[in-house]
Amino acid sequence: MSQEYTEDKDVTLTKLSSGRRLLEALLILIALFAVWLMAALLSFNPSDPSWSQTAWHEPIHNLGGAPGAWLADTLFFIFGVMAYTIPVIIVGGCWFAWRHQSTDDYIDYFAVSLRLIGVLALILTSCGLAAINADDIWYFASGGVIGSLLSTTLQPLLHSSGGTIMLLCIWAAGLTLFTGWSWVSIAEKLGGWLLNILTFASNRTRRDDTWVDDEEYDDEYDEETDGVQRESRRARILRGALARRKRLAEKFSNPRGRQTDAALFSGKRMDDDEDIQYSARGVAADPDDVLFSGNRATQPEYDEYDPLLNGHSVTEPVAAAAAATAVTQTWAASADPIMQTPPMPGAEPVVAQPTVEWQPVPGPQTGEPVIAPAPEGYQPHPQYAQPQEAQSAPWQQPVPVASAPQYAATPATAAEYDSLAPQETQPQWQPEPTHQPTPVYQPEPIAAEPSHMPPPVIEQPVATEPEPDTEETRPARPPLYYFEEVEEKRAREREQLAAWYQPIPEPVKENVPVKPTVSVAPSIPPVEAVAAAASLDAGIKSGALAAGAAAAAPAFSLATGGAPRPQVKEGIGPQLPRPNRVRVPTRRELASYGIKLPSQRIAEEKAREAERNQYETGAQLTDEEIDAMHQDELARQFAQSQQHRYGETYQHDTQQAEDDDTAAEAELARQFAASQQQRYSGEQPAGAQPFSLDDLDFSPMKVLVDEGPHEPLFTPGVMPESTPVQQPVAPQPQPQYQQPQQPVAPQPQYQQPQQPVAPQPQYQQPQQPVAPQPQYQQPQQPVAPQPQYQQPQQPVAPQPQYQQPQQPVAPQPQYQQPQQPVAPQPQYQQPQQPTAPQDSLIHPLLMRNGDSRPLQRPTTPLPSLDLLTPPPSEVEPVDTFALEQMARLVEARLADFRIKADVVNYSPGPVITRFELNLAPGVKAARISNLSRDLARSLSTVAVRVVEVIPGKPYVGLELPNKKRQTVYLREVLDNAKFRENPSPLTVVLGKDIAGDPVVADLAKMPHLLVAGTTGSGKSVGVNAMILSMLYKAQPEDVRFIMIDPKMLELSVYEGIPHLLTEVVTDMKDAANALRWSVNEMERRYKLMSALGVRNLAGYNEKIAEAARMGRPIPDPYWKPGDSMDVQHPVLEKLPYIVVLVDEFADLMMTVGKKVEELIARLAQKARAAGIHLVLATQRPSVDVITGLIKANIPTRIAFTVSSKIDSRTILDQGGAESLLGMGDMLYSGPNSTMPVRVHGAFVRDQEVHAVVQDWKARGRPQYVDGITSDSESEGGGGGFDGGEELDALFDQAVNFVTQKRKASISGVQRQFRIGYNRAARIIEQMEAQGIVSAQGHNGNREVLAPPPFE
């Protein structure tokens, strides 16, 4: 045998023919080429030299070398992502050719042509689908050139969805043409696979879910074959497999088993209507069975098998069943009801529920059960006593009834379930209790009951009488119908398992009362079956009454709150307690028990009628009466819910809690009073009343019983306490204001509610315990002047009512408003919860100046740098290797555009890196400037800026953004020697240049600055950085600001600093007046400087300082006695620099127009020597805003990111700003320089600005100059600090002319006096300011208001 096997497996090498040799060698080479091609495609790198890129001097990254890179680039260009399928198709073709090499059939050219057409259709449609639906790969189209052509052709015609559908259809047809497969066969094949998978899974699931172990049957077979000689192991395995297969076949072929499986997996419930009901014994369920009959609680028709309504006695079938069960039938625990059923005689389950006590069923020794009385909190009300609770009717709750009688198990079969069923014990016998009549309660509406109800816990008594044990005798050989008994047993087990897994729907809208669990009745000896059946009728009635009382009991009990639920499955098996469904009794059955429910339709009609009556009654009542009724109803519901929740112990617990809280409150108040008296005993002001414990007598719970008004009452006397009424008012936390102690007014007293709890003391910070808080007379404002904010810890806050006298009792000086309080330090408490909004708009955060509290004056002359955010201590090092790689890449990209250049140096900065290029001889820098966008694309960067000229170097700069941008902090720019050593008070910092060095400028040398950039480019942050740098450099006597902020957002935060000449101007008319005042101030300063013989403001201040050192101040040479109220001749003082900042210059130009342009032009031309400097910022850098007149006098400009090169030329007179990166990236064109410098602006947070502003506010208040924004001085000519513009020389003559002619016109004055139009217009404006003529009307005419002169 082994020789034959060896001879069959010998492999002989047969020689192939020449044609076969050539074919197989060719197939091997083609397969290797496909592998090489796949490697080249997978390792493709766009930087390798290829068909689309020729110049490269670096190593090739492609695994296929230069040919692989070239071929991969070509395939990607033609086919896109479908190029990856080409090697797979090649390998598949080789396999097909090798499989069909032995067939010598003739060639069907028609079939070949169809296959070629199919291949062409598949290739075209695949590329088109990839181009429409897939993302591009590298810089190739996802479908290649083929897909791009198809997608561009189909998109206008069919859109993307229609094109995709059409290409899919063509692809399906091409697959059929190429393979010859029918789509019907493909669908059948796919369906067959799917069904096989589902069949395998379902069969495996069914086999796994069978919880009956097959080993128990193996034991039987082993017992049968004990006497037989042991077979071989192979025979035993085969015999066991055949037997198991036969059993499985019989199991699934049994019609009763199939019906059981259908019942198990159908998802139906036991109470569904069906033709045949299967019980645990495999026969149709009896109609009078409560659990398995399928009768529903909603079935209204009469049922002749109803054990409650058909008039037949229940004792007859029960006696017969009990007698039969005692001999042959087994007791199954699969149909245990959920609702409490009366146990058998002798069973006394103890239910841990305080409301209802269950009594045993009357038997031979026991009488009728007695239901425990309802708790005191249980109040039976008539149905629909409250119309607003009509939506929750009491009959919507299922009322429990007693289940079907339970039968005892035979001793022979009861032992089989001992391991699965819970251990049952025999209770002790008790004497017969006294018979009492059972009261019948009407169930209450469910709206007053809580929704959660824990089930009662049943305590099983200790067993005293065990059951008689009987050994089970198993026959040596199974009887004739043993397999049928086994199938019947397994069917019964399957039905129990089906009852186990019935789905239980969740309640949706109505609150279902709890279903108390039932204790499984113990086994009863057969001799007592008739007696038990005889006493079952009375037991059912008493159980129904007990169930009705349990349904009407309160739905929440503290006694059973933490009890475990017995309806928990603890293993596999239907014998454990589980939530089975019980048929809900009908109204007719409940009527037979004595529980009568009204008709639902009648109750609904009554509820609707009550709601209509309530609505009509409410329509006639006033709002106050409706509100009072609503509060009373809320109070009643709250009291009722509390009584239902806590039962009869609610009032007692409340009183005990009140006593405990009162004692704890008194102890805490005493300790707090002792500590406060010890702290402030010797420091209380005269007339102040001592500390009282009554001041702390408040608690959050008192709001529930407080009926007083919520707003504080202002009465001269002490308000008596009012008797509160318990109302569950919605909690509205109000801040508690502590009334300051007054020496004359009586001490305010707070209302004391009746339920004190733990006090909430007001802890005060001992910052200034000596100085009392100033008292203010505020008869119209209910808020105290110095509040102490405190938020209670409880969610319900008290609402104390305090009093404040409307008028002083006597004319005491304490009620006057003090000019400067001694130490008005308000003592704020940290709120633990956000306070409720107040009725008044007086809030610190709504103040224009913010918090007006006096702050501690700093000791340093200038703000500290600690107010600013420090830069990070760790700085990321420069990656020189990455910069070298980028330099080589720049050279390569320039070489692609036929530009020979070498990177000789690079300068890394925080935001960008500048590469210095050494161009080849004859290469113009303009060529690189024109390629800026192409270079940005090829280098994969956001923007590239080309610097054609680098001062001092023969190179061209190429600025590229860094991959990781760093933040420039203001603190690190201010903390450098260049800023500290600059003596000018107008020194400003801009940021850092590309090398990381700080850029510091002097506004006095600029002398004016124009800032422009789009929204979000960092323009406002740059202006804030310049303002903060001047605040860190100059005192208020050195620099003063006039801030114009049309947006009312950016510059308004500086309101209140001492550097301001006037408030932050937000009205454009006031802005024009402020600019006009600046022009007048410039003229006044020029007069003073000319009188002193100096050329600028610095020389003027030096003269003033020199005269002060000499002790001979210089008098004002232009002062006249009538100019001011000064008695002595005023002297000249030091003049500060004035910086006029305009945040949105374009809005100012649009609103006011030409007048502002003229004023700005005059300031830009002449204001430098007078110490007045302009900073103009705008978001719209257009020629109508930044006119040539303004640009000619403002040489210093800063350009942030703009949208186009035209805007860049408008600002800088050259391009470059359109290539900036934003977020503070700017081009700074300094004075006496034509080449802008790229600067990365310093970042300033809002918190830093507020910190510096608060620091300057603590140093002093601003001294505003009157008349800067007023109209009278703007038109009348008054300007300067204390002077005005003189009237025109022809003013008197022009007034005489106008009053005589009674006609005021500019042209008339111009012709009469032969003067220019501007001078005539100025004279008319002066007349209007003096009130001689009126303003222009809608038609441009003016009325003469002055009377005519006397003749």
Curated annotation (Swiss-Prot):
Residues 357-482, 559-589, 602-871, 1264-1283 are annotated as: Disordered. Residues 602-614 have a biased composition (Basic and acidic residues). It comes from the Bacteria. Residues 45-74, 133-162 are periplasmic. It comes from Salmonella typhimurium (strain LT2 / SGSC1412 / ATCC 700720). Its main location: membrane. GO terms for molecular function: ATP binding; DNA binding; DNA translocase activity. Residues 402-415, 422-433, 665-674, 724-838, 858-868 have a biased composition (Low complexity). This is DNA translocase FtsK. PROSITE patterns: FTSK. The keyword Chloroplast does not apply.
